Amino acid sequence: MLTVSLLVCAMMALTQADHDGVLKGTATEAGEVSPVFRSRRALVCPAGWTLHGQRCFYSEATAMTWDLAEANCVNKGGHLASIHSLEEQLYIKDIVAGIVWIGGSACKVAGAWSWTDGTPVDYRTWCPTKPNDILSDCCMQMTAAVDKCWDDLPCPASHASICAKAAI
């Protein structure tokens, strides 16, 4: 009797899960159903982008101003990269060469840094004596230094850039 009760409960749970869209069944030739959990699908990035965590990154080698670099990233469906941890900093450091624009800006109010993607500035790795908070130096770059620390520069300078967007 206990076995029958357990089987009925299991069948009801699976039926409800399938009804709620949690399971996607694939029938085999023997008529068995092999459940595939949708929440377990792999995250992917478009061609040319690399996956790290839940975000995709695109290294743009063409040198351009900070404003054009941001517009280029937006055109690709993202923004200049925001960096939220040492792990992300190290990942980006490994996929870029030289100086690159990243998504930080303080052009509206000197010293009030924000990311172009709207996420909070919750991690910082400024170079020593930076930022200098001069309003003309209001765009953020990752330097070519070994540690790839951040520096504030005038936005009209031309550099490569790194874009980021959510993986799908």
From Swiss-Prot:
Keywords annotated in UniProt: Antifreeze protein, Disulfide bond, Lectin, Secreted, Signal
SMART domains for the chain: CLECT
Reported impact of residue 153 to F: Nearly identical thermal hysteresis (TH) activity with that of the wild-type
Protein name, per record: Type-2 ice-structuring protein
Physiological role: Has antifreeze activity to protect fish blood from freezing at subzero sea water temperatures. Binds to ice crystals and inhibits their growth. The thermal hysteresis (TH) activity, the ability to lower the blood freezing point, is approximately 0.45 degrees Celsius at 0.15 mM for this protein.
Disulfide partners: 45-56, 73-163, 107-138, 127-149, 139-155
Extent of the signal sequence: 1-17
Primary location group: secreted
Domain C-type lectin: from-to ranges: 52-164
GO molecular function, one term: carbohydrate binding
Entry's localization field: Secreted
Database matches in Gene3D superfamilies: Mannose-Binding Protein A, subunit A
Any one of the GO CC terms: extracellular region
Residue stretch(es) of the prosequence: 18-34
